[in-house]
Regions:
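C-terminal, active-site-flanking charged/polar segments
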Residues: 287-291, 647-687, 909-910, 915-951
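Fe-S ferredoxin-like electron-transfer domains
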Residues: 46-261, 265-269, 274-281
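Flexible glycine/proline-enriched surface loops and loop-helix/loop-strand junctions
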Residues: 171-175, 413, 684-693
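N-terminal cofactor/phosphate-binding cores enriched in small/glycine residues
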Residues: 2, 7-73, 114-115, 119
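Intrinsically disordered, low-complexity terminal tails and inter-domain linkers enriched
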Residues: 83-106, 555-582, 918, 980-1001
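Long, contiguous, secondary-structure-rich segments that constitute the structural scaffold
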Residues: 100, 506, 510, 526, ...
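Catalytic alpha/large subunits of respiratory electron-transfer oxidoreductases
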Residues: 128-132, 179-180, 186, 190-191, ...
Length: 1007
């Protein structure tokens, strides 16, 4: 590690780092704007200027940009010293001189004590020339990086008295608000949106000193990661629009560490609450999983928690089918009475249905309450087959199931059957970084540091690491793929097995197969990605076969297996980890819901919904845990279940169609109001904590089940009083869950003798927050189940990383304060890892390769239905958030341009879909809107999966298509304006060009 000197102090720094990164990692506050740890350096803002000296005798030095200057052995720099390289107390600034400079009249220049600081102050002053004086009304106020840096450099008075450049703002959709006047042209937004996330509809548009960041015209941002602009932007240009509707300042938000429930990736999040409402979601850094970024479903998809359709009280249905709200204790007693046989009566058979969106602890309690043999996981039949198959593969494979950080090191990627951007969005963002490993390799050969972002991109141009996508339809990653192949699901499985054989030395007659095999064989860290979206277990088998073949290849060639990987990211160039060299091959699966893998490991295919239906007459009581069976069973199957005389008890968050047929409904708390453990698709168990107490008589599902067990006479479960005890019991029940106890500290943990506060020390209005209801000062809510408190009292420091509720440090009020919680910039958090991996690769794993012979289902005049998932609309809960529902649009049928011509339809027309009756499924007919795709597998059409109107469609079914002449096209969505001149004007009427949208400022000098 090189040794450098900063203001006379000696620091050992990371090899290959730049000066800015080295200073921040050492705890030195050096201002910056354009640099970002995940996006590298471009040196555009000039804010991180430091003075570099040639040697110890040099007293003049020269100004260099910290983010563009690599560290070297013995290098000498100064941030605050004006007297040369060898000042004894360099960090001590001449406060008298600074005070004099601040208090001096603005028209009389006063000398600043050193040229580095003077330069940084000049940069801030120039950035402020056109910046508005609107901090009190800016949504970024109080967590603004520009505010922090302005204070840090000591700039206070503005000398510029001229007119400011002003801009018109754009409508960018329901998620992002745009205020261009606050821009400081750091280029972070464009670099993230275009360079990092692959977006194409936001850019820098400029003419001399007039720079505008936005779209070419108003419209919804197309990227699935647009919400990250809120955190990437150091000012208030891009802000959280849903938050603006119910705004609270950062310091007033109550937060807790949590896990996103939008998909199975397991991204770490920080939900914020005020007035009993979930206000927003911010990214919670986890260097192994989501890093600095979230997808838009994860960031904006939790609005359903504030929905008026939330269940506040338990309800029991009477003989007339009407529900009556009852107290929680009464509901428990009714349920226990149903579950216990009265004297002389036959013992009731109790069956439980779990849920892949409920916590591991809640599913465990339900399984123990009803017995393993009477517990169904709650997957649909085909989903159950695929998910359990994935779980079996992960438990036995020799390949590594990688984290997203490890995926970013891949130098060749094969994707089988998944549109990853829509089924595991954060994984897709990681794969976009993986294809840049070719650029990093070229940079290394040219002697460029990979953090020199602009230079590396200019060097590589369009050269990328190979990515082969084999799918039924176009995907959002097609733009970076080296090869795309369009095949039906059963043919995708055949393709995968053919690639495995080609890797093993049996070439195929299909050149596409041989090209894919060659790309994987020539890679040092190949990655195979597949998943459950096609509901086709043969596809996941073929992915496992490819990973097995690659592992065999690495084991046969120890030289290749032990080779040192090339640099893989702007900061981190470490190998995968200490896993045996046979695990250089990586295998990752995309799963449908947040706890799908955890539930599969817990249930082990003990019961399926079909088998449960076959013996419905034997069941006395059915307990359904957070599972809307209308999404997993056909209408006929649901009717059969609910009309069989079974007493149905449902635990649920939101009202849905199934609940109308239940006898007792228990109001469950959401993830933001309860604690639990989720197992991600990586096999990482992670804990989430309540952000605020559950309102009314909502209880966490595990609390309902614990109380029900106690009243119904289940003595063993009745002894489990605390959540930690349930987690420990679950861990003891299965060797795979043995690490659960180490996921997070128990409820007795204290930091410096106190619980960890969920509120900042600046939280306001504690005694007056409910004054509109009662003037009586409310008691602080207690939380006996976690190490966190619903209070500002305590210390948010030195605790395990899994317990950090928010990021703040003196002088760092924005989310950039994160670097004060990291062991090094862009490195792991202090306080240990977040979560525990439950599944590791097996040294002597069982091969999953198997022969597969597909059924030939092509029929003239019929097309095979394949599911097409959407990041907005396919998920059950997030789709009930207003903004997500707006983006989801209507359900659709996606077809090729050739088929569209044959049917004489265009985008937006209607198509009738007729599906013939098959075993157990009646014939079906419906009409859907047409979406025309650039590529679709032959003889296939895709439908929007997860939408309520397409739930009856079955993957693989054959459908007849015809134009619907009676179809009514959807009303075009007009572009809305955020700045209407009339308070009651419709949002769908944009202002005219003559509208004065900023009356409080000078007249615009340009638009």
């Amino acid at each position: 590690m090189p040794t450098i000197f900063v203001d006379g102090q000696e620091f050992q720094v990371k090899e290959g780092a730049n000066v800015l990164e080295a200073c921040l990692s050492a705890g030195i506050d050096l201002p910056y704007f354009c640099w970002h740890p995940s996006m590298g350096s471009i040196g555009s803002c000039r804010q991180c200027a430091v003075v570099q000296y040639q040697n110890a005798e040099d007293t003049n030095g020269r100004i260099v940009m910290g983010c563009m200057t690599p560290v070297s052995e013995g290098a000498r720099f100064s941030l605050n010293s004006g007297s040369g390289a060898d000042q004894d107390s360099p960090s001590a600034v001449d406060e008298t001189a600074i005070e004099a400079s601040v208090q001096a009249p603005i028209d009389v220049p006063t000398k600043v004590p050193d040229k580095g600081r003077e330069f940084r102050q000049a940069v801030i002053e120039s950035l402020m020339l056109n910046h508005p004086h609107d901090c009190p009304v800016c949504a970024e106020g109080g967590e603004c990086h520009l505010q922090d840096m302005t204070v840090m450099v000591g700039h206070r008075d503005r000398r510029y008295r001229g007119l400011k450049n002003t801009h018109r703002n754009q409508y960018l959709g329901p998620l992002i608000s745009h205020e261009m006047n606050r821009c400081i042209t750091c280029y972070r937004c464009e670099r993230f949106y275009t360079d990092y996330a692959g977006g194409t509809d936001l850019s820098a548009q400029a003419s001399h000193d007039h720079v505008y960041f936005g779209r070419h015209q108003d419209g919804v941002l197309e990227s699935e990661f647009s919400g990250n602009l809120v955190e990437v932007c150091p000012t208030g240009v891009f802000t959280d629009k849903p938050l603006l509707k119910q705004y609270s300042r950062k310091w007033d938000l109550q937060s807790a560490p949590s896990i996103c429930t939008g998909c199975a990736v397991g991204c770490n999040i920080l939900p914020g609450e005020r007035y009993g409402k979930l206000k927003r979601i911010h990214n919670r850094y986890n260097d192994e999983v989501n890093g600095y970024f979230l997808c838009d479903r994860g960031r904006f998809g939790s609005g359903y928690i504030n929905s008026e359709e939330r269940l506040n009280y338990a309800g029991v249905r009477d003989f007339n089918g009407e529900f009556t709200a009852i107290k929680a204790q009464e509901a428990i007693e009714i349920a226990a009475r149903w579950m216990k046989a009265e004297e002389g009566e036959k013992t009731q058979k109790i069956v439980g249905i779990g849920s892949p969106r409920a916590s591991l602890e809640a599913n465990y309690l339900l399984r123990e309450l009803v017995g393993k043999e009477h517990f169904a996981a709650g997957f649909g039949d085909r989903e159950s087959q695929v998910v359990h198959r994935i779980a079996a593969i992960l438990k036995t494979t020799r390949a590594k199931n990688p984290s997203i950080k490890q995926m970013e090191t891949a130098d060749a990627v094969l994707i089988l059957g998944e549109d990853v951007t829509h089924t595991a969005p954060r994984v897709a963002l990681g794969l976009r970084q993986a294809v840049r490993n070719k650029a990093h390799e070229l940079a290394k050969q040219a002697g460029l540091a990979v953090w020199q972002d602009a230079a590396v991109r200019n060097l590589a141009q369009d050269q990328r690491s190979p990515m082969i996508i084999v799918s039924a339809t176009e995907t959002r990653l097609d733009d970076i793929a080296s090869q795309t192949v369009s095949l039906a699901p059963q043919e995708i499985a055949l393709f995968g097995h053919a690639v495995a054989r080609a890797i093993a030395g049996q070439p195929s007659d299909d050149e596409a197969v041989n090209e894919a095999a060659a790309a994987l064989k020539n890679a040092q860290r190949p990655l195979v990605v597949s998943g459950s979206s096609m509901l086709h277990s043969a596809i996941v088998d073929s992915a496992a076969a490819v990973a097995d073949a690659l592992t065999d290849l690495f084991q046969a060639d120890s030289t290749l297996a032990n080779s040192t990987p090339a640099d893989s990211s702007p900061i981190d160039s470490s190998p995968i980890d200490s896993t045996p060299v046979s695990c250089n091959s990586m295998l990752s699966f995309c799963l449908p819901e947040c706890n799908s893998l955890g539930l599969a490991l817990l249930s082990e295919e003990q019961e399926t919904l079909s088998r449960l239906l076959d013996r419905a007459e034997e069941i006395g009581v059915l307990v359904i845990l957070e599972n809307n069976l209308n999404r997993r069973l056909s209408e006929e199957q649901v009717t059969k279940l609910t009309s069989s005389g079974i007493k149905i008890i449902a635990l649920e968050l939101l009202d849905n169609d199934l609940l109308a047929n239940c006898d007792l409904v228990l109001s469950a708390a959401s993830y933001a109001e309860s604690e639990g453990t989720l197992v991600s698709s990586e096999g990482r168990a992670q804990r989430y904590y309540p952000v605020f107490p559950a309102a009314h008589e909502r209880l966490a599902s595990w609390q309902w089940l614990r109380d029900l067990a106690a009243v119904s006479g289940h003595s063993e479960l009745a002894e489990l009083q605390h959540f930690d005890q349930i987690t420990a019991a679950c861990g003891a029940s299965n060797p795979l869950f043995a690490a659960l106890a180490g996921v997070s500290p128990d409820h007795n943990f204290r930091s410096h003798g106190q619980k960890i506060p969920r509120q900042t020390h600046r939280a306001s209005g504690r005694t007056a927050i409910n004054a509109d209801v009662s003037v009586q000062e409310p008691l602080r809510k207690l939380d006996p189940e976690t190490p966190l408190s619903f209070s500002m009292e305590g210390l948010n420091r030195d605790q395990p990383a899994s317990l950090t509720p928010f990021y703040w440090s003196p002088g760092w009020n924005s989310n950039q304060a994160l670097q004060k919680f990291q062991s090094e910039v862009n490195g792991p958090l202090r306080g240990g890892p977040v979560g525990q991996r439950l599944i590791e690769p097996q040294t002597n794993g069982i091969s999953q390769s198997s022969d597969f012979t597909p059924l030939r289902i092509v029929q003239e005049g019929r097309w095979q239905l394949v599911p097409m998932h959407r990041v907005h609309g396919s998920d059950e809960l997030s789709a009930r958030t207003a903004e997500v529902a707006e983006l989801a649009g209507e359900a659709f049928i996606a077809i090729s341009s050739e088929l569209a011509a044959k049917l004489a339809v265009v985008d937006g027309d209607g198509v009738k879909i007729n599906v013939a009756a098959t075993a157990g499924i009646d014939s079906l007919g419906l009409s859907l809107s047409v979406k025309i795709l650039t590529r679709v597998a032959p003889n296939c059409v895709a439908y929007s999966a997860g939408y309520s109107s397409t739930l009856a469609l079955q993957p693989g079914a054959l459908a007849e298509l015809s134009k619907d002449s009676d179809w009514q096209r959807a009303t075009p969505q007009l572009i809305a304006s955020d700045r209407s001149s009339h308070a009651n004007a419709s949002q769908n009427n944009p202002p005219s060009p003559d509208t004065d949208i900023d009356k409080g400022r000078e007249e615009p000098r340009h638009v």
